């Protein structure tokens, strides 16, 4: 059997003046993933369809400048805190911390200079039947207002069976809050929109949100709502504005509460279990998301408006992709009804998310 390999080439210059590297992981069986050291961006994810034709199933931009100046987090690693923190503040152990607001009066994805804007150190390696690159980042005490120095690793690993895994670890020297994720935009057809895709989410509940994206209260059961994706549903039917929550967001931009969602950031990762299954029209490609995380933010690219172009000159339009962000719950640092997102010294944050392509094994 062919063995996975790792390759490297330069990919432009970051705003800091540092050279951005592109690391290409090849499975040896047709899949490949390209990762940038700027933002830890998953730049391409090439996947064969049932006919053997390979397309990238993630949106990407043409240059580092586009990612740095225009990108709505396309493909990036998100931290220190994925999703929103209400009013850009939270209280931990009696001290209130303030995060710069960058989304309708709230802190989104770690603030305006989150981990998606940083240069990550890269170390490639191969082990067994996997090719991998380990990215590392040191976030100093007070970075974007968050307490404690945080050392983070994010390891992308591609194996010969066609699974792309993303594993995070983080350790701190002071109590802090942590939620890390990848913000790739998926389109399994490689072109067009995702209205013809079907999506299944293995979750009994979701978090309704206010107009500004902040959870408005406790989780609500999905039964009888547009958010019931416990069986495969056509996305084009579900992102129509018939439901008030969907109309308000312009589609899905909500967090589903996955089964067994009792994970704390300062403990071992939860059980790796399936969170979602996304299927392209005609089942030409199928992707399953497996994760140890408690929440899945489903975002149907509601704010894309055609002003961004990918490397082929294609305009990225509304609903041209769907994000499946595995994470802790939005605004959990301010919510007693959510599992804790607090990480304390001596504990290690750990999470794993797999992107699997079962159509390749049938």
Q: Where in this protein do the model-derived segments appear?
A:
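An exposed, glycine/acidic-rich loop-and-rim segment of catalytic or binding clefts
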Residues: 1-362
């Amino acid at each position: 059997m062919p063995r996975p390999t790792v390759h490297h080439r330069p990919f432009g210059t970051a705003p800091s003046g540092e050279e951005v590297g592109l690391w290409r992981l090849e499975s040896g069986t047709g899949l490949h993933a390209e990762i940038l050291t700027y933002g830890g961006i998953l730049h391409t994810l090439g996947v064969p369809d049932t006919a053997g034709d390979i397309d990238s199933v993630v949106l990407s931009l043409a240059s580092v400048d586009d990612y740095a100046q225009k990108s709505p987090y396309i493909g990036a690693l998100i931290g220190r805190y994925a999703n929103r923190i209400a009013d850009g503040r939270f209280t931990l152990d009696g001290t209130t911390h303030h995060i710069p607001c960058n989304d309708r009066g709230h802190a989104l994805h770690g603030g305006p200079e989150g981990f998606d804007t940083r240069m990550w150190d890269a170390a490639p390696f191969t082990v067994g039947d996997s090719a991998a690159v380990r990215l590392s980042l040191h976030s100093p005490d007070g970075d974007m207002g968050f307490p404690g120095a945080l050392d983070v690793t994010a390891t992308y690993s591609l194996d010969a069976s066609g699974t792309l895994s993303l594993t995070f670890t983080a350790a701190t020297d002071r109590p802090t809050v942590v939620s890390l994720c990848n913000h790739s935009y998926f389109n399994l057809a490689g072109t067009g929109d995702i209205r013809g895709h079907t999506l299944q989410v293995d979750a009994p509940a979701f978090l309704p949100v206010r107009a500004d994206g902040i959870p408005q209260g406790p989780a609500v059961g999905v039964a009888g709502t547009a958010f019931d994706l416990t069986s495969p549903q056509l996305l084009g039917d579900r992102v129509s504005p018939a439901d008030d929550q969907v109309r308000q967001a312009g589609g899905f931009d909500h967090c589903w509460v996955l089964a067994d969602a009792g994970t704390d950031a300062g403990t071992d990762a939860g059980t790796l279990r399936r969170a979602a299954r996304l299927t392209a029209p005609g089942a030409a490609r199928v992707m399953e998301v497996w994760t140890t995380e408690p929440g899945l933010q489903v975002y149907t690219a509601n704010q894309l408006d055609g002003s961004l172009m990918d490397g082929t000159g294609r305009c990225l339009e509304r609903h041209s992709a769907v994000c499946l962000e595995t994470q802790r719950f939005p605004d959990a640092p301010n919510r007693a009804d959510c599992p804790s997102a607090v990480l304390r010294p001596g504990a290690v944050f750990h999470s794993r998310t797999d992107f699997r392509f079962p159509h390749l094994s049938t």
